[in-house]
Amino acid sequence: MDKPMYKRVLLKLSGEALAGERGFGINNDVVNDIAIAIKKIQEIGVEVAVVVGGGNFWRGRTSEGMDRTTADYIGMLATVMNAMALQDALENIDVATRVQTAIDMRQIAEPYIRRRAVRHLEKERVVIFGAGTGNPYFTTDTTAALRAAEMEAEVILLAKNVDAVYDKDPKVHADAKKFTELSYMEVIQKELKVMDSTATSLCMDNKIPIKVFELTTENIIRAVKGENIGTTVK
């Protein structure tokens, strides 16, 4: 395999992506494929941190009638389920993995401690961050931007169920325009569905590029090698 473009990356996985075509729960085949991709990029010297969403179990913004704070905490718990599933898949193929959660649940995961997380990465362990930031009103996209800054990751790999960023939904509009490169401000001003504005602003302030692409094993590897796939935001 070619030499990687990045030494340390943060891979952001949406919960929906983990569900596969079923749209709900965890698709073991998808999770196993992601684990294989992570192992392959780790084998060429890339340190990998992961942030997982929880949308395959819970969508807080659509929980009508529920207190927003409560809904967000339920969403955080959903991300921990996904983190544990991915950890299991990775360890089944002999990839040392640690789950760290922003909410203390020591029976199943380490508490989030920045220095410890960095040390795990340096020791070639995959670190999966669960429970978001630990605070309501913050998305897992914002978690990804925050953890990428804290881990000093060189790029956020945003693996989604679409192949790039478009000006409108390509599944609905045949004339949707595909972007290959965007600035942070364009994403914010055009309200493009990349990350929410808080996450995008955090990436802009810390000069962390974002690569958006369709979640496949091959694409994760290609993104790490710096190939022109999907959309790059910088």
Swiss-Prot record:
MF terms (GO), sorted A to Z: ATP binding; UMP kinase activity
Record keywords, A-Z: Allosteric enzyme, ATP-binding, Cytoplasm, Kinase, Nucleotide-binding, Pyrimidine biosynthesis, Transferase
One GO cellular component term: cytoplasm
Protein's cellular compartments: Cytoplasm
Residue ranges of the region described as Involved in allosteric activation by GTP: 20-25
Pathway: Pyrimidine metabolism; CTP biosynthesis via de novo pathway; UDP from UMP (UMPK route): step 1/1
Highest taxon of the lineage: Bacteria
EC code(s) of this entry: 2.7.4.22
One Gene Ontology term from the biological process aspect of the record: UDP biosynthetic process
Gene3D superfamilies: Acetylglutamate kinase-like
InterPro entries in alphabetical order: AceGlu_kinase-like_sf, Asp/Glu/Uridylate_kinase, Uridylate_kinase, Uridylate_kinase_bac
Binding of ATP, residues: K12, L13, S14, G15, G55, R59, N161, Y166, D169
Catalytic reaction annotation: UMP + ATP = UDP + ADP
Binding-site residues, UMP: G54, D72, T133, G134, N135, P136, Y137, F138, T139, T140
Regulation: Allosterically activated by GTP. Inhibited by UTP.
Described function: Catalyzes the reversible phosphorylation of UMP to UDP.
Subunit note: Homohexamer.
Family (UniProt): Belongs to the UMP kinase family.
PANTHER family xref list: URIDYLATE KINASE (PTHR42833), URIDYLATE KINASE PUMPKIN, CHLOROPLASTIC (PTHR42833:SF4)
Protein name, entry field: Uridylate kinase
Species assigned in the record: Clostridioides difficile (strain 630)
